[in-house]
Swiss-Prot record:
GO molecular function annotation: agmatinase activity; manganese ion binding
HAMAP family with a match to the protein in the record: SpeB (MF_01418)
CDD domains: Agmatinase_PAH
Keyword Magnesium: no
Organism, scientific name: Citrobacter koseri (strain ATCC BAA-895 / CDC 4225-83 / SGSC4696)
Pathway: Amine and polyamine biosynthesis; putrescine biosynthesis via agmatine pathway; putrescine from agmatine: step 1/1
Reactions the enzyme catalyzes: agmatine + H2O = urea + putrescine
GO biological process, one term: putrescine biosynthetic process from arginine, via agmatine
Cofactor(s) needed by this chain: Mn(2+)
Protein name in UniProt: Agmatinase
PANTHER family the UniProt entry points to: ARGINASE/AGMATINASE (PTHR11358), GUANIDINO ACID HYDROLASE, MITOCHONDRIAL (PTHR11358:SF26)
Record carries keyword Manganese: yes
Length: 306
């Protein structure tokens, strides 16, 4: 298999074990998995501090501290008893070739989705979401986007590979519908005419969680949803290990409650991106990312018990 290597993980920046100590499966297409975790160690599209290629490894490493809890608080059940989740390791591509990464990731995602799997991906910088959206749109059609970030990433700078342009490109390619999409935690300059509903960090920090979730549900409706979480949505006090930190963000507590509140949406794909462990302190950024990823899986598992 050319995309993910052979029966061992030959990524230069990967772990030898899976997320939550889950089994590594380098042939996930023919497995009985419900959700497949894929690491995307890519940071060539970064405009700030590089190092996101080491994000997947950092998330997996710290996730071992989350694996022990079976009846996770406050869910009171074990996600692993309801979902079959496997980790297929990292996407392998020629470091330095952004186009190859994009094409291989899209092909990998298309193959998984065609086999009836769902994807949770770990970046890497946020550009990796664009090839994932392309694959998901081929399978599910135009989607709603629920996007946690400090930046809208809707900047039209003419650069093909840039972690600040994906959500300018995606609507133009018909991948997502901005009128049914929400960007949460924004606290940098953005174009107010791009069609997205923007819930900036000031209002997200001041409003009640239930009120925000009700608005998100109303905007998204019953559309298929792609959920993407850039870790710089969190305040640097909770996530210093990222490429473009911005003061004034969400607490980890608020972010977790918001993610839990998305359980009624028709989420078809998910990612957590922009962890750069070289700038982390005591692995708190990686831990936040791993915890948010785990909560994403729990909102999927909760539906299995309904």
């Amino acid at each position: 298999m050319s995309t993910l290597g052979h029966q061992y993980d030959n990524s230069l920046v990967s772990n030898a074990f899976g997320f939550l100590r889950l089994p590594l499966n380098f042939q996930p297409y023919d497995s009985d998995a419900d959700w497949v975790i894929t690491g995307v160690p890519f940071d060539m599209a970064t405009s700030g501090r590089a190092g996101g290629r080491h994000g997947p490894a950092a998330i997996r490493q710290v996730s071992t501290n989350l694996a022990w809890e079976h009846n996770r608080f406050p869910w009171n059940f074990d996600m692993r008893e309801r979902l079959n989740v496997v980790d297929c390791g990292d996407l392998v591509y020629a470091f330095g070739d952004a186009r190859e990464m994009s094409e291989k990731l899209q092909a990998h995602a298309e193959k998984l989705l065609s086999a009836g799997k769902r994807m949770l991906s770990f970046g890497g910088d946020h550009f990796v979401t664009l090839p994932l959206l392309r694959a998901h749109a081929k399978h599910f059609g135009k989607m709603a986007l629920v996007h946690f970030d400090a930046h809208t990433d809707t900047y039209a700078n003419g650069c093909e590979f840039d972690h600040g342009t994906m959500f300018y490109t995606a609507p133009k390619e018909g991948l997502i519908d901005p009128n049914h999409s929400v960007q949460i935690g924004i606290r940098t300059e953005f174009d107010k005419d791009n069609g997205f509903t923007v819930l900036d960090a000031c209002q997200v920090n001041d409003r009640g969680v239930d009120d925000i979730i009700a608005q998100v549900n109303q905007i998204v409706g019953d559309m298929p949803v792609y959920l993407t979480f850039d870790i710089d949505c969190l305040d640097p006090a909770f996530a210093p290990g990222t490429g473009t930190p911005v003061i004034g963000g969400l607490t980890s507590d608020r972010a977790i409650k918001l993610v839990r509140g998305l359980k009624d949406l028709n989420i078809v794909g998910m990612d957590v991106v922009e962890v750069a462990p070289a700038y982390d302190q005591s692995e708190i950024t990686a831990l936040a990312a791993a915890t948010l990823a785990l909560e994403m899986l729990y909102i999927q598992a909760a539906k299995k018990g309904e």
